[in-house]
Amino acid sequence: MASGTVGGLSEVYSSAKRILLRARNGIEKLERFDSDPTDLASSVKRDITEVQSLCSNMDGLWRSIPVKSQRDLWRRKSEQVGEEAEYLNQSLEKYMWRNQRKMLEAKERADLLGRGSGEGAHILQIFDEEAQGMNSVKNSKRMLEDSFQSGVAILSKYAEQRDRLKSAQRKALDVLNTVGLSNSVLRLIERRNRVDTWIKYAGMIATLVILYLFIRWTR
């Protein structure tokens, strides 16, 4: 009795997995629009319904298996089939909802175009301009974020160079003090240090000005 039940379960399970694969391939074709969406969607829906029916049969069969280890194994397989069928069913429903929305939008657009060059065409032009404006805002935002990141990287580079320069200057001054060079040489080094500092700040200010002008330009 147990072997017969397991054998029947194996056949039902194999059939369910085969139909699941066919339904999954059908949904992938729907996403690519390789076939007629209406007929293919109906075929996929029938496959999912058939798998759900087979899953109910499996649920009744595995409960009659006396050996607990085998019963638990087939329970998990039955649950797996049910979960896959539910996932495909949700995917199909999402596709059908998106497809219906696209068809509705296309119909509304056609209705607006059908009104000629009057109010409908004007409304359609407004929609197109708003869509272009949103795309322009997204592009400007992305460019601004890229420019900001570049500015931050430049400022970080300046800060890193400043720290390295200060460390090198301290070491140089220590060496100069050790060998006893003249005060004129030390003043020359300090003057060069001030010039480098001004160059650094000028670069930072120029970067901020460029960012400000870019923000004003994108608005």
Curated annotation (Swiss-Prot):
Residues 2-197 are cytoplasmic. GO terms for cellular component: cis-Golgi network; Golgi membrane. One of its GO terms (molecular function) is SNAP receptor activity. The chain crosses the membrane at residues 198-215. Its main location: Golgi. One of its GO terms (biological process) is regulation of protein secretion. The modification N-acetylalanine is found at A2. It is found in: Golgi apparatus membrane. Keywords: Acetylation, Golgi apparatus, Membrane, Protein transport, Transmembrane, Transmembrane helix, Transport. It is a single-pass type IV membrane protein. Involved in transport of proteins from the cis/medial-Golgi to the trans-Golgi network. This is Membrin-12. It comes from Arabidopsis thaliana.
